[in-house]
Amino acid sequence: MANIKSQKKRILTNEKARLRNNAVKSELKTAIRAVNTAVESADKDAAGTALVAASRKLDKAVSKGVIHKNNAANRKSAISKKVNAL
């Protein structure tokens, strides 16, 4: 355990950030999974809707600093390729 006051505060803020980041990453996985499910069922409309939602969540995660912008770009590219292949 830290003895320095600022480090005690950082431990608390880091824990809050970790929980928030895990929640956002979980939402991302769910959104991407929805796109993949729609693609597997060959449902073009659902896949397009899910793609827009997933892209939006990826962009929000980048703006919150949860993931890097290149990581989001790669993920969006991958799911877009799957949807466009329908």
From Swiss-Prot:
UniProt signal peptide: none
Molecular function terms, GO-annotated: small ribosomal subunit rRNA binding; structural constituent of ribosome
UniProt entry tagged with the keyword Iron-sulfur: no
Biological-process GO terms, alphabetical: translation
Entries under Pfam families matching the protein: Ribosomal_S20p
Top-level taxon in the UniProt lineage: Bacteria
Purpose: Binds directly to 16S ribosomal RNA.
Keywords: Ribonucleoprotein, Ribosomal protein, RNA-binding, rRNA-binding
GO cellular component: cytosol; small ribosomal subunit
Glycosyltransferase listed as a keyword: no
Protein name: Small ribosomal subunit protein bS20
Family: Belongs to the bacterial ribosomal protein bS20 family.
